[in-house]
């Protein structure tokens, strides 16, 4: 069995936010990794001075725990920077990994932190859970013996994203713990040295006597050793007794000095009976002071009550206070009763003790009678009774007039309607004219907007058609210019040739005329093709405009039908409401009449008693009746006025709507007629254009022939030919006029 060497121990006194949290004690595994343990112990004691690289004291005192990860570990030991980037060992810089024998298989183990292999410095960490993934990477060199709750408290601190605790966890003080056994051994050594000197004198005398008797026997030596042990025990006991006596002797003089001090203090000679009582504060007392007799009586009564009533038993006065309600409930407590228990059957006490007073109940019943339950809910837009009356009057008239206008659309012309409107306006007053103007302005704005939109669409289509026609005209003009230039060149060329070749045969002239006719036919065909293309484009644009007009008319028709259905629904609702209100008003009027009859009956009986008062009351009644009748008449007049105004305004609106419809229909009719005429023109124009183009070509060819012949022939023949050409021109003009009369749409087609 080897001797067990005691392992060194170190401690940390930790503070959280400068408040002491407790002490943590570590046991270092110096037998497994002595170099690492010596590094940690020296950093705890601070005995190695300053570091070589950091030039700071090699000491954990006032060092921070810079990293805390819950359910993993608590790290510290960076005495140079305090953020995990600094630190230094006592050996200077880093030192190598010593041993990985101890595994991270339990919590509260002390291990070295590093930056990789063989980079151990001063930083360490304490595990709070088993961490087997760190085995072989970090050296375990100790464990926590006490202060586990302090480590848990550090672990539970709140941290930021970098695992740094928000609270400041600092090591206030640190060092090495020396065990008590070492101190005892040192004291024993001292005692042995002192006892050995005293026992040596006694042993020398005894040895001289016994040496003569039995020097060779071994038993004597054993006895001597026993005796020495006994003497040592006796001496130790004596030393202990002497220490106790010394302690007692030290205490006794202090007690004697205290007794002397007590004796030295002066004793009081005043008796407690002679001390007067402390006076009461009566500075703010307004009442007269109570008499002494009253106080004595009260004191006596209290004493008697205490004698009669023991402390556990309740007083009789309190027992009598228990009151019982009529339903058998006990009322406990002190003070007045403020709440009454409600009756269980409310039907009994309904008339005797009702929640509402009788006059209030009568008013409630009367208010409920006046209400007439209408089945319909409130609809958005019902602002007042006047608006409802207006709608009631408007709606039936609108329906009838719409029907009439629909029947008369085809018969009446817009001019007749305008004349009728003028006649109606002459008969109306200025105030009505203003209303009409406002309504007409609104309608005109609406119509103008519609007309503008239609005009814009039509103008766009027209502008497109014009641009197309301009392009065509420009192309046509270019072609004609080219033709004219080519003809002039041909003429010059021909004149030169004719001068050179005057003696050519007539066959050549015939061939030339044939070639010219063929070229003219080709040109006429190309012109016809261009005209047909332009006509097709015009037809497409017209069909698109017709489709747009049809869609707009469909939308307007749908909107009209929706408006008609809405007006019918509103008229039905207004009729039902007005009917309900008339009923409620008639009921109220009957009730009012009955009350007046009752009052008159009562007043007649009173009038018999007091005839003077009855006259004054009759006058008052007459005045009231007259006022009420005047009010009713004024209300009826106002209602009639409103109805007449509404009916007139509705007539105007419907007339204006009818005119708009007629105007739109006439427009559609006129547009359709125009389209038909355009179609007819388009159908007629290609034939006429072809005729005209053929005639123009013939005339041009004849003129060219005449010019060529004139140059070759004599002046007499030239005159004859001129007369013939004039006749041909006259015939050509006549043909042109005929064509113009037969096809009136050709100019429009050319212009676009």
From Swiss-Prot:
GO function terms (MF aspect): cyclosporin A binding; peptidyl-prolyl cis-trans isomerase activity
Region named Disordered: 182-752
Record-listed Phosphothreonine modification sites: 356, 746
Matches recorded under InterPro entries: Cyclophilin-like_dom_sf, Cyclophilin-type_PPIase_CS, Cyclophilin-type_PPIase_dom
Subcellular location: Nucleus matrix; Nucleus speckle
Gene3D superfamilies per record: Cyclophilin-like
Stretches with biased composition (Basic residues): 182-193, 226-251, 327-345, 448-461, 599-625
Listed Pfam families: Pro_isomerase
Chemical reaction(s) catalysed: [protein]-peptidylproline (omega=180) = [protein]-peptidylproline (omega=0)
Documented EC number(s): 5.2.1.8
Keywords (A to Z) from UniProt: Isomerase, Isopeptide bond, Nucleus, Phosphoprotein, Rotamase, Ubl conjugation
Residue ranges constituting the PPIase cyclophilin-type domain according to the UniProt record: 11-176
UniProt cross-link Glycyl lysine isopeptide (Lys-Gly) (interchain with G-Cter in SUMO2), position: 390, 691
Phosphoprotein among keywords: yes
Comp. bias (Low complexity): 194-214
Regulation of activity: Inhibited by cyclosporin A (CsA).
Keyword Phosphoprotein among record annotations: yes
GO BP, sorted A to Z: protein folding
Function: PPIase that catalyzes the cis-trans isomerization of proline imidic peptide bonds in oligopeptides and may therefore assist protein folding. May be implicated in the folding, transport, and assembly of proteins. May play an important role in the regulation of pre-mRNA splicing.
Subunit details: Interacts with CLK1, PNN and with the phosphorylated C-terminal domain of RNA polymerase II.
UniProt remark on domains: The RS domain is required for the interaction with the phosphorylated C-terminal domain of RNA polymerase II.
Protein name: Peptidyl-prolyl cis-trans isomerase G
Species per Swiss-Prot/TrEMBL record: Rattus norvegicus
């Amino acid at each position: 069995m080897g001797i067990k060497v005691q392992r060194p121990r170190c401690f940390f006194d930790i503070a959280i936010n400068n408040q002491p949290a407790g002490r943590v004690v570590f046991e270092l595994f110096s037998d497994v990794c002595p170099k690492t343990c010596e590094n940690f112990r020296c950093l705890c004691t601070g005995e190695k001075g300053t570091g070589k690289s950091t030039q700071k004291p090699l000491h954990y005192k006032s060092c921070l725990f810079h990293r805390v990860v819950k359910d993993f570990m608590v790290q510290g030991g960076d005495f140079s920077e305090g953020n995990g980037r600094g630190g230094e060992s006592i050996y200077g810089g880093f030192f190598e990994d010593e041993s990985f024998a101890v595994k991270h298989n339990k919590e509260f183990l002390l291990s070295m932190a590093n930056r990789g292999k063989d980079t151990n410095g001063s930083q360490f960490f304490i595990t709070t859970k088993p961490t087997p993934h760190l085995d072989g990477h970090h050296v375990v060199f100790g464990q926590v013996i006490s202060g586990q709750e302090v480590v848990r408290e550090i672990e539970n601190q709140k941290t930021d994203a970098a695992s740094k605790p928000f609270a400041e966890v600092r090591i206030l003080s640190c060092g090495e713990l020396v065990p008590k056994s070492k101190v005892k051994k040192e004291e024993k050594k001292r005692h042995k040295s002192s006892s050995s000197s005293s026992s040596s004198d006694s042993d020398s005398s005894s040895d001289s006597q016994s040496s003569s008797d039995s020097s060779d026997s071994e038993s004597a030596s054993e006895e001597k050793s026993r005796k020495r042990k006994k003497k040592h025990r006796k001496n130790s006991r004596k030393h202990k007794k002497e220490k106790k006596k010394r302690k007692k002797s030290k205490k006794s003089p202090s007690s004697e000095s205290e007794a002397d001090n007590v004796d030295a203090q002066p004793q009081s000679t005043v008796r407690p009976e002679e001390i007067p009582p402390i006076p009461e504060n009566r500075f703010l007392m307004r009442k007269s002071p109570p008499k002494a007799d009253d106080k004595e009586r009260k004191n006596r009564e209290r004493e008697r009550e205490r004698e009669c009533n023991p402390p556990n038993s309740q007083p009789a006065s309190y027992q009598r206070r228990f009151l019982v309600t009529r339903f058998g409930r006990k009322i406990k407590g002190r003070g007045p009763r403020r709440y009454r228990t409600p009756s269980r059957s409310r039907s009994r006490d309904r008339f005797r003790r009702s929640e509402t007073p009788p006059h209030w109940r009568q008013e409630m019943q009367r208010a409920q009678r006046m209400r007439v339950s209408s089945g319909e809910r409130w609809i958005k837009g019902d602002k007042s009774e006047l608006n409802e009356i207006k709608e009631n009057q408007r709606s039936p008239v609108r329906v009838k007039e719409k029907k009439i206008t629909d029947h008369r659309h085809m018969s009446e012309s817009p001019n007749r309607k305008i004349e009728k409107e003028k006649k109606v306006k002459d008969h109306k007053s200025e105030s009505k004219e203003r209303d009409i103007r406002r309504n007409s302005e609104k309608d005109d704005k609406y119509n103008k907007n519609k007309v503008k939109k239609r005009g814009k669409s039509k103008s766009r289509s027209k502008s497109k058609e014009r641009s197309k026609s301009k392009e065509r005209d420009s192309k046509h003009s270019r072609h004609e210019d080219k033709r004219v230039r080519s003809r002039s060149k041909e003429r010059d060329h021909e004149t030169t040739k004719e001068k050179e070749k005057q003696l050519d045969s007539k066959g050549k002239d015939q061939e030339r005329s044939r070639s010219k006719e063929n070229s003219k036919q080709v040109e006429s065909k190309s012109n016809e093709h261009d005209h047909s293309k332009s006509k097709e484009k015009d037809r497409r644009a017209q069909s698109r405009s017709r489709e747009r007009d049809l869609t707009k008319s469909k939308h307007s028709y749908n909107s009209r039908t929706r408006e008609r259905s809405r007006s019918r629904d509103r008229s039905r609702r207004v009729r039902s409401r007005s009917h309900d209100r008339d009923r409620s008003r008639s009921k109220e009027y009957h009730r009012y009449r009955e009350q007046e009859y009752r009052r008159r009956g009562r007043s007649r009986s009173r009038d018999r008693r007091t005839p003077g008062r009855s006259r004054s009351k009759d006058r008052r009644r007459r005045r009231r009746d007259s006022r009420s009748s005047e009010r009713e008449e004024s209300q009826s007049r106002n209602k009639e006025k409103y109805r007449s105004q509404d009916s007139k305004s509705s007539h105007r609106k419907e007339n204006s709507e009818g005119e708009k419809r007629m105007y739109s229909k006439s427009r559609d009719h006129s547009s359709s007629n125009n389209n038909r005429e355009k179609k007819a023109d388009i159908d007629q124009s290609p034939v006429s254009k072809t005729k005209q183009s053929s005639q123009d070509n013939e005339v041009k060819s004849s003129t060219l022939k005449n010019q060529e012949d004139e140059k070759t022939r004599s002046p007499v023949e030239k005159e004859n030919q001129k007369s013939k050409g004039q006749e041909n021109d006259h015939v050509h003009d006549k043909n042109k006029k005929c064509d113009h009369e037969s096809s009136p749409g050709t100019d429009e087609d050319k212009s676009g």
